[in-house]
């Protein structure tokens, strides 16, 4: 749309596009000016070819690359995008030296403003989720002098706000989460001053680990959040701090790695990895030298016939998160799965910095052709579990989130979150059968593969998980 002057008004020229990545529930944005043909990208994902292609299709030039903060849940593609397009990076200089980016950029502070064509960006410092966090208040100046959009990053979500505990719980910065919660409370008081009509465009949606109750709609308004967002309905600071910190989900362990890589200089990966097909000899040589095999097939296939020591992480929207929980960033990666899915799998891995993909195989034949046996974990129904758990002295291991376990579990079950299982293997019995369950069977499959890696052979995967147990009407603690 081009600007057309009339006697009364000018038609807006703003370009806007949300790019949503379901796996990490991550929203990035392209915001620009069609008249000047320039556009900014906010909180870019790492596979930046998406933005370059959109800009090409829309006859736009990417000139500005923006970030709201140093992200913990994904590896930001700002540097790759700037390298490929010649755009300049505009990043926060708030929060103090400890939270400063270690590479060249245009530093932004509260009250700064800049233009992308005719589109004005005003910078707000909104500490709470992180000390350096900033937001962008956007005005389409040909249309009005009144701001219309607020790009809130991990500050305000639909129905929630960003968690302030990640620096302490995931990155090891002791004593930061209470201070962060108080900063969040103060930042929200300023947020309340915004007009109700302003659209809010956050960096995450439902399913993200960056909050505990994010809504599942793509955007919201200031007025709507004032009505329904729990964080804006609490006016007592002490109650707010307690409520914000209570019940936050377990942060994936890879978050600490993302914090470091997003802040420091690192090697750039400017294209999606394209792994090669491995022949049996090369596959076995890589495995012998420590390569980790990621079995991305459906759990019904991996649990029934798997390559020994492989990790079973199905290619679905949770792949990035569970790969971050389970894989070693210092080891090479081999993908086992359908060839048609490899581009998607590689994108999901590179988005969290897992770049050391050395090849792929599309079947277990590379193992069995050498007359090597496959491994498996038997399934057990909830009816069998109920019948056998007392008579057979079965140890029930529930690998769901702590909040899920607290809401209800099989009587006598033991809880260890699947992501922390590696750190608690010594607590598991070697002389009892272990029945592993999650909500429906996906996380328990991952946990079973980890247990097999560490020598546990007396394990069962519970079909349908706790959902099936509960649906059957069995007793619950």
Predicted regions and their residues:
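Rhodanese-like catalytic fold shared by cysteine-dependent sulfurtransferases
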Residues: 101-102, 163-165, 177, 224-257, ...
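Active-site metal-binding motif and surrounding structural segment of the metallo-beta-lactamase
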Residues: 46-90
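Active-site neighborhood of phospho(di)ester-bond hydrolases with catalytic His/Asp-centered motifs
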Residues: 41-42, 61-71, 90-93, 125-128, ...
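Active-site metal-binding loops of divalent metal-dependent hydrolases
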Residues: 44-45, 70, 94-95, 129-130, ...
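Conserved beta-strand hairpin/beta-sheet module of binuclear metal-dependent hydrolase folds
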Residues: 9-61, 136-138, 143-153, 158-159
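Metallo-beta-lactamase
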Residues: 37, 120, 130-250
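Short, well-ordered beta-to-alpha junction loops that form the rim of enzyme active sites
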Residues: 202-207, 212-213, 257-259, 296-298, ...
């Amino acid at each position: 749309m081009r600007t057309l002057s009339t006697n009364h008004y000018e038609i807006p020229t703003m370009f806007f596009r949300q790019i949503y990545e379901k796996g990490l529930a991550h929203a990035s944005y392209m915001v620009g000016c069609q008249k000047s043909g320039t556009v900014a990208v906010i909180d870019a994902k790492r596979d930046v070819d998406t933005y370059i292609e959109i800009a090409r299709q829309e006859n736009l030039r990417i000139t500005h690359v923006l970030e709201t903060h140093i992200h913990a849940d994904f590896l930001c593609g700002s540097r790759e995008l700037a390298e490929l397009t010649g755009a300049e990076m505009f990043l926060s200089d708030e929060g103090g030296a400890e939270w400063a980016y270690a590479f060249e950029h245009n530093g932004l502070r509260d009250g700064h403003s800049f233009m992308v064509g005719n589109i004005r960006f005003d910078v707000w410092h909104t500490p709470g989720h992180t000390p350096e966090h900033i937001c962008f208040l956007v005005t389409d100046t040909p249309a009005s002098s009144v701001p219309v959009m607020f790009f809130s990053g991990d500050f305000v979500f639909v129905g929630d706000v960003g968690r302030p505990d990640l620096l302490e719980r995931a990155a090891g910065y002791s004593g930061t989460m209470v201070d962060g919660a108080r900063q969040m409370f103060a930042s929200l008081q300023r947020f309340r001053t915004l007009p109700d009509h302003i659209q809010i465009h956050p960096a995450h949606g439902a399913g993200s680990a960056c909050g505990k109750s994010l809504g599942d709609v793509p955007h919201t308004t200031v007025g709507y959040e004032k009505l329904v967002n729990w964080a804006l309905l609490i006016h007592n600071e002490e109650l707010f701090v307690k409520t914000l910190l209570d019940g936050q989900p377990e942060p994936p362990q890879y978050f600490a790695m993302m914090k470091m890589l997003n802040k420091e200089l690192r090697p750039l990966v400017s294209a999606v990895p394209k792994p090669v097909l491995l022949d049996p000899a090369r596959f076995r040589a890589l495995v012998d030298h420590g390569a980790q095999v990621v079995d991305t097939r459906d759990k019904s296939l991996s649990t029934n016939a798997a390559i020994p020591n492989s990790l079973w992480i199905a290619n679905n929207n949770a792949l990035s998160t569970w790969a971050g929980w389970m894989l070693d960033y210092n080891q090479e990666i081999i993908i086992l799965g359908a060839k048609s899915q490899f581009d998607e799998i590689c994108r999901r891995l590179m988005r969290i910095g897992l770049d050391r993909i050395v090849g792929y195989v599309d079947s277990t034949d590379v193992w069995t052709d050498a007359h090597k046996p496959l491994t498996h974990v038997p399934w057990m129904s909830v009816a069998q579990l109920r019948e056998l758990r007392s008579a057979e002295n079965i140890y029930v291991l529930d690998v769901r989130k702590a909040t899920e376990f607290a809401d209800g579990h099989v009587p006598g079950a033991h809880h260890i979150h699947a992501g922390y299982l590696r750190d608690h293997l010594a607590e598991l019995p070697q002389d009892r059968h272990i029945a592993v369950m999650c909500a429906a069977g996906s996380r328990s499959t991952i946990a079973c593969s980890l247990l097999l890696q560490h020598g546990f052979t007396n394990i069962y995967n519970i079909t349908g998980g706790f959902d099936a147990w509960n649906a059957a009407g069995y007793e619950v603690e």
